[in-house]
Amino acid sequence: MSDQFEKLLTTFQHHLEVERNLSVHTIRAYMGDLTSLVEHLEKLGLNDISTLELAHLRSWLANQGVKGGARTTLSRRAVSVRLFTKWALKNNYISKDVGATLATPKGHRTLPAVLDVQKAALAMDSMATRAAEEESPISLRDVAILELLYATGARVGELCGLNIGDIDYNRNTIRVLGKGNKERVIPMGKPAIKAVQVWLKNGREELV
């Protein structure tokens, strides 16, 4: 690595440590990405950061993909470069932020793993046993939360937004506000209703 690039990366690392106050792990990852970029640039014959172009960055990122880099890793490397070029422009090392439009590769999305019936039942039993042993408001609350999640399939965010009045004990339903402020009415079983009632009676007042 040339002296110019080495000094540049050292200055940028100081910026990450002092001004951005990033974690050691994050800084190590960013600097590893930028070291890889600089090595690629030097192979292309680029030794002056002021001549950096978007094509150089795309070439490097594509090369990382050919080497088998995971999409999540490529995404982080794109972030590293954009952070660097933004800083370089601000400090007059380059005349335009060539990394601003560097696309972040989309990560591969997989369906979340789900519990089978036996594991779900085991989790419920374990929580109920703990609540019975501890007799604490928090344990009763946790049982109610777990029962509601299992019985209704509601999202965690939806559950966090619930009010006591959203539960209809006569119809055994619960009203949740989902994405896009769309309201849904979901049926719920007796175990969930009982867990909520026990928590309201024996635990809620101590936590409010």
Question: What residue ranges belong to the model's regions?
Answer:
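Conserved catalytic core of the tyrosine transesterase superfamily
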Residues: 1-208
